[in-house]
Amino acid sequence: MSLNYEQNAADEQFARAHKAVSLSDDEESEGQAETTSAPNQEPHVSKSPREYYDEPGGKGNGSGADDQDEPETEAASGAANTHVVAHHYNELKEAGRKDRQKSKIFFMRNFNNWIKSQLINEYMSQIKQNKRMGDALRVLDMCCGKGGDLLKWEKAAISHLICTDIAEVSVEQCQRRYQDILQRSEKSKFANKFTAEFFACDSTLVRLRERYKDPSLQLNLVSCQFAFHYCFESMAQADCMMRNAAECLKPGGFFIATMPDAYEIIRRLRAAGPDARRFGNDVYSIEFDCETDPLPLFGAKYQFHLEGVVDCPEFLVHFPTLVKLGRKYGLQLLKRSTFADYYKENLHHGRHLLQRMSGLESVQPQRCENDEEFAHVSNFQGAQRSRSVGTLSKSEWEAATLYLVCAFKKCKNTWDTNGKPLFEFDD
């Protein structure tokens, strides 16, 4: 059995499942964003949509995925775990900097934050290059949490921000942080002042546009950081989430996200043993609640534990399915990179920011000799054993490299005689 979960894009079983659930009228686009598959080496993915709707979280029959008029009713049928996720994030305590510095994953959190900064900067730069002078710059921070990216939006000189999250407590904390930024900006004539709106709701169940102060507004960028995977509880929820990401994006606008890499998760699960349901290290662990052979396209539920954080149920994101859902709403895949690859791509021009954000731990040579977590540093240092090296511990790196970044572009469209959009994809 292959360890490469990615290659299912052109697998016959995967194609049958997609046709059965009618994800899109555009069957020609299937798998174009992915590499060629080797069907005889793939993990078994359920052929029948009925199988994976019977998995945890899946209750829909798949017949209404193309119905764009009633997403809330469709999505609600598969939302068995949304209240668990909301409770999890509402219960998280807001730790101070001193408490965070004591954590085993202090540097990993900073590293992840740097990844987000690089991703946001990459696509905000492209937007600014193409927009006209004086045009508004509007952003949706979908699943905004406590507002960890507010300073990034301020530095990006945006005009308006929409923040939404499933956890009411998080949205309240986010709004307070925004007010603090506003108060600080009053003291500086150079500070960027941007307007914002906040509301709590589940983006996998609710059409966000109907909650905006101006439902007709057009967005330049939609960002969903470390949260998109929750929508893969069911197809209807994933469809609703992708619609929310794409619906108000201007043509040429971007949807960017970070999420767990299902292919890497499955690779590590297989490496743990033929009957393994759990793997991890000192700072993280993953334990599957569903059958892993065959793997369902939706409802592939696992429990994720991170050091110092309450366990929370999550779902694998089958990436070819994500790409196909995106195309349904006019989103074309531009980028898919693992955190490891994205780090390499951005290190040269992002090194200074990485240092400022304490994204790597400075490790002295003598520590490497006695600490297994930093044994890899000795190999890197070579002859220069007197110099300290910036790195992550082995356990932190293993946790960080469970994730990927991705970016989509909203395509222009015309309309057919039935009033359906015909998107102009580049491929």
From Swiss-Prot:
The GO terms this record gives for MF are: mRNA 5'-cap (guanine-N7-)-methyltransferase activity; RNA binding
Concerning PROSITE patterns, the annotation shows:
RNA_CAP0_MT
Q: Which UniProt keywords apply?
A: Methyltransferase, mRNA capping, mRNA processing, Nucleus, Phosphoprotein, RNA-binding, S-adenosyl-L-methionine, Transferase
Q: Which GO terms describe its cellular component?
A: nucleus
Region Disordered: start-end pairs: 1-79
**Catalytic activity of the protein:** a 5'-end (5'-triphosphoguanosine)-ribonucleoside in mRNA + S-adenosyl-L-methionine = a 5'-end (N(7)-methyl 5'-triphosphoguanosine)-ribonucleoside in mRNA + S-adenosyl-L-homocysteine
In which residue ranges is the amino acid composition biased (Basic and acidic residues)?
A: 44-57
Q: Do you know which SUPFAM superfamilies this protein is assigned to? A: S-adenosyl-L-methionine-dependent methyltransferases
Q: List site positions: mRNA cap binding.
A: K146, K152, R177, H229, E314, Y403
Phosphoserine-modified residues are where?
A: S22, S24, S29, S46, S48
What does the UniProt entry say about where the protein is found?
Answer: Nucleus
Q: Where is the mRNA cap 0 methyltransferase domain?
A: 103-411
Q: Which GO terms describe its biological process?
A: 7-methylguanosine mRNA capping
Q: Per UniProt, where does S-adenosyl-L-methionine bind? A: K116, C143, D165, D202, Q225, Y230
Task: Cite a single Pfam family from the UniProt record.
Answer: mRNA_G-N7_MeTrfase
Q: What does this protein do?
A: mRNA-capping methyltransferase that methylates the N7 position of the added guanosine to the 5'-cap structure of mRNAs. Binds RNA containing 5'-terminal GpppC.
- Report the family membership: Belongs to the class I-like SAM-binding methyltransferase superfamily. mRNA cap 0 methyltransferase family.
Name under which the protein is recorded: mRNA cap guanine-N(7) methyltransferase
Q: Which organism is it from?
A: Drosophila melanogaster (Fruit fly)
